[in-house]
Design a protein with these regions (language model features):
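Ferredoxin-reductase
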Residues: 10-123, 140-141, 175-178, 188, ...
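C-terminal accessory/binding modules appended to enzymatic or scaffolding proteins
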Residues: 281-321
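Short flanking/linker segments adjacent to small metal-binding domains or redox-active Cys/His motifs
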Residues: 206, 361-373
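FNR/FR-type flavoprotein reductase catalytic core
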Residues: 112-278, 282-287
């Protein structure tokens, strides 16, 4: 997708845009409520459309884990649409509706459009919840570091851990000033409900300046034995990373959520060119475990595994389709693959057999993978 910023479309403009062919993996949700969290942040509460002409969405397609995100398709006059990922602030354990929070940014076309034009009753295309910024267990003690709208997935993890887990939760939350604190009331209510388990430490730049690595290290020092989840602007996450390195927190304990702008269109219909393999060894065979079922599919060597699965109608998880986010990660059980791009898996992940389905090509005649580990 072209990321140049065009003028913001009004709702009256939408009917004038040409329809883009969308894949069968695309879902349509209805905005049930828009909540003004701060002057520049809005929460979008979604509902499943239930009109007679609305397609049915199986509940499993909207099942999610704390810390995951939705990818939204936002209309654009210049490009037809842009795709943006927004973390779910809702908890699958305490909230009935999926909810994302969008903070307006100065040069962000999508965030400005959503803050200006999203309203109850509006329908919007999304991809199924995805992402790997997810605790392995909710019974751990947690250290959660957030800045600005980075509180969104942190809030989901916090609410879920308090509701379903048994450990201590510490949130370190940095903002520009008191008026820019998203979920201020909700955090206060949670602190009152769980006074012996939740500690929220606020950092206000207007009073304390920018949070440095040294300052964050001092705040985090009592909690170095916990899993750490970090989300926020780049400089904040870098300061937090340095702080944890200074404290010698093992890298395996540290989880960082990073979103990148998407260059391709993850909403587009997937096309597989079977003829492309005519001059080589022919297609490989993939045996795929997904949601408790086992599927055997023909895998053209020129095609990526995710594209093959989507073209077959399988509900494989993904988001960016560019090798950046890790949402499509799957465990390789047998055979060999090559990946075009890998911007997210570290050597430890590769050693454990993880691959990116959106970038994987077969190197052997048979490949076995599982999404169910």
């Amino acid at each position: 997708l072209n990321r140049k910023r065009g003028r913001a479309l009004t709702e009256a403009d939408l009917d004038q845009l040409p329809d883009e062919p969308l894949g069968d993996h695309v879902l349509t949700l209805r905005i049930a409520e828009v909540v003004a969290e701060t002057d520049d942040a809005r929460s979008l509460v979604f509902a499943v459309p239930d009109g007679p002409d609305d397609p049915q969405i199986p509940p499993a397609r909207l099942r999610y884990s704390p810390g995951q995100f939705l990818t939204l398709r936002v209309p654009s006059e210049r490009t037809g649409s842009v795709a943006r990922c927004y973390s779910l602030c809702s908890s699958p354990f305490t909230d009935e509706a999926l909810t994302v929070t969008v903070k307006r940014t100065a040069d962000g076309y999508a965030s400005n459009w959503l803050c200006d034009h999203a309203h109850p009753g509006m329908h919007i295309h999304v991809l199924a919840p995805s992402g790997t910024f997810v605790p392995k267990t909710l019974d751990d003690d947690f250290l959660l570091l957030a800045a600005g709208s980075g509180i969104t997935p942190i809030m989901s993890i916090c609410k879920s851990a308090l509701s379903e887990g048994s450990g201590q939760v510490t949130v370190i939350y940095a903002n520009r000033d008191e008026n820019s604190v998203i979920f201020c009331d909700a955090l206060r209510e949670l602190s009152g409900k769980y006074p012996d388990r939740l500690t929220v430490l606020h950092w206000l730049e207007s009073l304390q300046g920018l949070p440095s690595a040294a300052a964050l290290a001092k705040l985090a020092a009592p909690f170095t034995d916990r899993p750490v989840f970090i989300c926020g602007p780049g400089p904040f996450m870098e300061a937090a990373r340095v702080a944890l390195e200074t404290l010698k927190v093992p890298a395996a304990q540290v989880h960082i959520e990073v979103f990148k702008s998407l260059e391709s269109d993850p909403f587009a219909a997937v096309k597989i060119d079977d003829a492309a393999d005519e001059d080589d060894a022919g297609p490989a065979t993939a045996v795929v475990e997904l949601d408790g079922e086992t599927y055997t599919v023909s895998w053209p060597r020129s095609a990526k595994l995710l594209d093959v699965l989507l073209a077959k109608g399988l509900d494989a998880p993904f988001s960016c389709r560019e090798g950046h986010c890790g949402a499509c990660a799957v465990t390789l059980r047998g055979g060999k693959v090559s990946m075009e791009v890998n911007d997210v898996l570290e050597q430890q992940d590769l050693d454990e057999g993880l691959i990116l389905a959106c970038q994987a090509h077969p190197e052997t005649d048979s490949v076995e993978v599982t999404y169910d580990d």
